[in-house]
From Swiss-Prot:
InterPro entries, alphabetized: SIFV_Orf14
S-S bonds: none
Highest taxon in the source lineage: Viruses
Protein name: Uncharacterized protein ORF99
Pfam families: DUF1374 (PF07118)
Length: 99
């Protein structure tokens, strides 16, 4: 997935989230950021680790997937496009993006 495709996908995620069309989803990422850098960017890992929680997952860690977290990820990507995020999967309630 190139930079332009990922940019479009993030815009779609933010739009759907703000329109309240995504009730639950997973966003799995492979990133060059280490755990502490990602915590500073997105927030601390969700300690409950419940399958019912929305989440942004890196390795074993589940991060808050609130509106603010998604906006932060989007803003950081646009602000520093040299960070190469790879979307491994995004699942919405209507499977609008398939794995």
């Amino acid at each position: 997935m190139d930079t332009h495709e990922f940019h479009k996908l993030l815009i779609k995620v933010v739009d759907l989230f703000l329109e309240d069309r995504i009730k639950e989803f997973e966003l799995k990422l492979n990133t060059t950021l280490d755990e502490l850098e990602f915590e500073e960017l997105i927030g601390k890992p969700d300690s409950s680790n419940s399958a019912e929680n929305n989440g942004i997952f890196i390795d074993e860690y589940s991060y808050d997937a609130s509106e603010n977290a998604i906006k932060k990820l989007f803003v950081e990507y646009v602000r520093q496009p040299e960070f190469k995020y790879t979307v491994l999967s995004i699942k919405g309630v209507n499977d609008w993006v398939r794995e």
